[in-house]
Amino acid sequence: MSLLPPLTIRLCSPRGFCAGVDRAIQIVILALKKYGAPVYVRHEIVHNRYVVEGLQQRGAVFVEELDEIPEKHRGQPVVFSAHGVPKSVSEKASLYNLFYLDATCPLVSKVHKQAIRHQRHGRHVILIGHSGHPEVIGTMGQLEKGAVTLIETVEDALYYQPENPNKLGFVTQTTLSVEDTAGILDVLQKRFPALESPATESICYATTNRQEAVKAAALGSDLFLIVGSSNSSNARRLVEVAERFGARQSILVQRADDIDFDRLGTLSVISLSAGASAPEIIVDEIITAFRKRYNVKIELAETAVETQQFLVNRELRDVILTPQDMAFVSGGVKTGRNDDTQMLKIEEK
């Protein structure tokens, strides 16, 4: 019989890498295998330091601007991050005669196309998102200056004054809070009944799925841990969702070492999820850290099963990706269904 105090960990599923993040990391790894180091990457490929450092160790070099690539290495490939880039970046790459591989998430690319479609139909584009986020910069950069208005809050929506309220279309950043976005859209649609929606939902399936799993696990949690980086939009939204839906406390952690166990107080139930840029190996690391201090029982809070996969760039499809190539980010509890795992009953809405 264990002398350690009992602890239930509610493990959210889905969690961690989405198909777009998986694809972006694979593109860098496959480019390194095919073309050799260095492979340059414009901006962090995904917003996670562990992933970035792991790729750096394999020969990736991260830059913020194409000008930072030494002239002697301009024959090497440069990868554009999963967040997408303004058109000016690919135009500059062509001007420099760079060989670039676009790792923009296909769902972000779809938002770009939706914004362009709105403009072609004579609509001014409203983008709901967070100022300064690379995805927002990339989406706004698909159209000329002045063609897109960024709306961040309900207050922005209340005071927005368009030139022509009858010729508006909206798109959204893919990693937003579903509830916050709904609140903004409610205001916009009441003020501007002619506001055109995109052809398909802009907030991506993975963002929605991770938020739904967090909602299911939050109520009754003494602590909700979200694995992710401070610059990860979707991870920060998960922290907010956890607290909004009943967790006593929710914190963002990058590694197990970030957890100050001495200050956690008495715990009986904690919940654990990970942002779409956070590797499963860190989830394993955190569970292991708790097992050293508690007699852990795992419950799986599963709200969806994800099977989505995206093809890598055509130039890389002749390279074989092995499990060892992805071992630095892969974990051992991807589904969470271990021998001591129980399913958490998810109430039907």
UniProtKB/Swiss-Prot annotation:
Keywords: 4Fe-4S, Iron, Iron-sulfur, Isoprene biosynthesis, Metal-binding, Oxidoreductase. Belongs to the IspH family. One of its GO terms (biological process) is dimethylallyl diphosphate biosynthetic process. The active site is at E135 (proton donor). Catalyzes the conversion of 1-hydroxy-2-methyl-2-(E)-butenyl 4-diphosphate (HMBPP) into a mixture of isopentenyl diphosphate (IPP) and dimethylallyl diphosphate (DMAPP). Acts in the terminal step of the DOXP/MEP pathway for isoprenoid precursor biosynthesis. GO terms for molecular function: 4 iron, 4 sulfur cluster binding; 4-hydroxy-3-methylbut-2-enyl diphosphate reductase activity; metal ion binding. Pathway: Isoprenoid biosynthesis; dimethylallyl diphosphate biosynthesis; dimethylallyl diphosphate from (2E)-4-hydroxy-3-methylbutenyl diphosphate: step 1/1; Isoprenoid biosynthesis; isopentenyl diphosphate biosynthesis via DXP pathway; isopentenyl diphosphate from 1-deoxy-D-xylulose 5-phosphate: step 6/6. (2E)-4-hydroxy-3-methylbut-2-enyl diphosphate binds at H47, H83, H133, T174, S232, S233, N234, S277. It is an enzyme of class 1 (oxidoreductase). This is 4-hydroxy-3-methylbut-2-enyl diphosphate reductase. HAMAP family: IspH. Binds 1 [4Fe-4S] cluster per subunit. Isopentenyl diphosphate binds at H47, H83, H133, S232, S233, N234, S277. Pfam families: LYTB. It catalyses: isopentenyl diphosphate + 2 oxidized [2Fe-2S]-[ferredoxin] + H2O = (2E)-4-hydroxy-3-methylbut-2-enyl diphosphate + 2 reduced [2Fe-2S]-[ferredoxin] + 2 H(+); dimethylallyl diphosphate + 2 oxidized [2Fe-2S]-[ferredoxin] + H2O = (2E)-4-hydroxy-3-methylbut-2-enyl diphosphate + 2 reduced [2Fe-2S]-[ferredoxin] + 2 H(+). [4Fe-4S] cluster binds at C18, C105, C204. Its EC number is 1.17.7.4. Dimethylallyl diphosphate binds at H47, H83, H133, S232, S233, N234, S277. Transmembrane segments: none annotated. Its cofactor is [4Fe-4S] cluster. It comes from the Bacteria.
